[in-house]
């Protein structure tokens, strides 16, 4: 009954006007969105994650684009996840890092790291934005909403090399955004942050780890296909069916894997 009520509610949510897509600038994108109140239960949050929604600030959203279904919701079934040999090597390589999971806490050190990360990794996209504009976006997107939110930090000798914001639902953790120091490429900090969060979610007894949107063939989003075993939400409106990646490839062969 509650699931049906939530689904009926989701069906009434507004859809934004079209704007340029952040992944494919030549395309137009739209989102279906819900500006939720300050408090939202973990069970309701879980329903939204299962329905393909993500969070920015106090906005839950999912893509709702006309003629494009390339943004695929991607999650790891944790009872099936076992670190591969390469993942174990990554754990060993970064065994000197201190890993902490706690309530999100914005500091000057993290703001400086965020700016360095943005200017290094997304130079062409943020070239016209001032430091103040970037920081205002970060504060609202990542640190404004702390209810059901978790922050992971990776530190070396007291220096923060990486932080990741996660959402804490009833059956899963969902990755919101990660920021890492570009001066340590050999450590693969982005991958290590994901791996550490997945293992933490397993320790908590969670069922899933949501990795956000997977865009097959996209230079910045294609990497998620290497996190397996995984499930993809079928790109069918209002049908919350998740299928294994192998089955998805067979059923939707038009996606360039």
Swiss-Prot record:
Under Pfam families, the record lists:
ATE_C, ATE_N
> What's its top-level EC category?
transferase
Subcellular location per UniProt equals:
Cytoplasm
Keywords of the record: Acyltransferase, Cytoplasm, Transferase
Any one GO MF term held by the record is: arginyl-tRNA--protein transferase activity
Which biological process annotations from GO are given for this protein? proteasomal protein catabolic process; ubiquitin-dependent protein catabolic process via the N-end rule pathway
| Catalytic reaction equation(s) | N-terminal L-glutamyl-[protein] + L-leucyl-tRNA(Leu) = N-terminal L-leucyl-L-glutamyl-[protein] + tRNA(Leu) + H(+); N-terminal L-aspartyl-[protein] + L-leucyl-tRNA(Leu) = N-terminal L-leucyl-L-aspartyl-[protein] + tRNA(Leu) + H(+)
E.C. number: 2.3.2.29
This protein's major location comes to cytoplasm
Q: Does the keyword Membrane apply?
A: no
Q: Does the keyword Cytoplasm apply?
A: yes
GO CC, sorted alphabetically, is: cytoplasm
Instruction: Output the HAMAP family linked to this UniProt entry.
Output: Bpt
Described function: Functions in the N-end rule pathway of protein degradation where it conjugates Leu from its aminoacyl-tRNA to the N-termini of proteins containing an N-terminal aspartate or glutamate.
Q: Per the similarity annotation, which family is this?
A: Belongs to the R-transferase family. Bpt subfamily.
What protein does this entry describe?
Aspartate/glutamate leucyltransferase
Organism, per UniProt?
Answer: Leptospira interrogans serogroup Icterohaemorrhagiae serovar Lai (strain 56601)
Q: What gene, per UniProt, encodes this protein?
A: bpt
């Amino acid at each position: 009954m509650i699931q049906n009520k939530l689904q009926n509610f989701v069906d009434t949510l507004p859809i934004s006007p079209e704007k340029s897509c952040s992944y494919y600038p030549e395309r137009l994108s739209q989102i279906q969105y819900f500006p939720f109140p300050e408090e939202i239960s973990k069970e309701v949050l879980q329903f939204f994650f299962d329905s393909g929604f993500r969070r920015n600030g106090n906005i839950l959203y999912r893509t709702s684009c006309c003629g494009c279904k390339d943004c695929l919701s991607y999650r790891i079934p944790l009872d099936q996840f076992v670190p591969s040999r390469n993942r174990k090597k990554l754990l060993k390589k970064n065994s000197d890092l201190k890993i902490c999971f706690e309530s999100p806490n914005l500091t000057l050190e993290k703001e400086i790291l965020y700016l360095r990360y943005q200017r290094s990794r997304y130079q062409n996209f943020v070239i016209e934005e001032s430091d103040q504009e970037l920081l205002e976006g970060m504060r609202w997107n990542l640190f404004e909403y702390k209810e059901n939110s978790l922050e992971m930090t990776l530190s070396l000798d007291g220096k923060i090399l990486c932080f990741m914001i996660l959402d804490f639902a009833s059956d899963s953790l969902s990755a919101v955004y990660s920021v890492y120091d570009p001066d340590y490429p050999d450590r693969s900090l982005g991958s290590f942050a994901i791996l550490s969060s997945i293992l933490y979610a397993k320790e908590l007894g969670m069922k899933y780890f949501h990795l956000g949107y997977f865009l097959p063939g996209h230079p910045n989003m294609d990497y998620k296909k290497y996190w397996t075993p995984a499930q993809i939400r079928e790109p069918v409106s209002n049908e919350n069916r998740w299928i294994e990646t192998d089955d998805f490839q067979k059923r939707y062969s038009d996606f360039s894997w």
